């Protein structure tokens, strides 16, 4: 009987130990997914630095399934706009964030 009691107690504590481990949560920092940076080319149709907008007639953009069209992009703080003017052919990168197309980088191209 004593042996049976020892086996029962051992089993009970083993089950409790495994259950405690199963309920332990590892609260590791989850990295947020980086937004997709999309590259495109087009022609600048207008620059409005006051409202932080640039209008570009861009070629089709397969990454977001967009046809060729003219649209406004939001100029972000890291965007260097010093040499960009209306009529320039440009290569640019942007991030789509909801309804906003956030310009990340833009360069005059040939």
Swiss-Prot record:
Q: Where in the cell is it found?
A: Periplasm
> Pfam family of this protein, just one?
CusF_Ec
> Taking the first listed entry, what is the main subcellular location of this protein, grouped into a coarse class?
periplasm
UniProt keyword list: Copper, Metal-binding, Periplasm, Signal
What is an example of a GO molecular function annotated in this UniProt entry?
A: metal ion binding
What is the annotated signal peptide range for this record? 1-21
Q: InterPro entries, from UniProt?
A: CusF_Ec (IPR021647), CusF_sf (IPR042230)
TM ranges are none
Q: Name one GO cellular component term.
A: periplasmic space
- Induction of this protein: by what? Transcriptionally regulated by CusR in response to copper and silver ions.
Its function, per the record, reads: Part of a cation efflux system that mediates resistance to copper and silver. Binds one copper per polypeptide.
Quaternary structure per UniProt? The cus efflux system is composed of CusA, CusB, CusC and CusF.
- Protein's name according to its UniProt entry: Cation efflux system protein CusF
- Recorded source organism is Escherichia coli O6:H1 (strain CFT073 / ATCC 700928 / UPEC)
Give the lineage: Bacteria, Pseudomonadati, Pseudomonadota, Gammaproteobacteria, Enterobacterales
């Amino acid at each position: 009987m004593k042996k049976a009691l020892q086996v029962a107690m051992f089993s009970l504590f083993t089950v409790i130990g495994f259950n405690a481990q199963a309920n332990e949560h590892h609260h590791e920092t989850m990295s947020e997914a980086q937004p997709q940076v999309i590259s495109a080319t087009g022609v600048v149709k207008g620059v409005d630095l006051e409202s932080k907008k640039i209008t570009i007639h861009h070629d089709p953009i397969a990454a977001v399934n967009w046809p060729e069209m003219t649209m406004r992009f939001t100029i972000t703080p890291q965007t260097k706009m010093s040499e960009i003017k209306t009529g320039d052919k440009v290569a640019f990168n942007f991030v789509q964030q909801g309804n906003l197309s956030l310009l990340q980088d833009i360069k005059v191209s040939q």
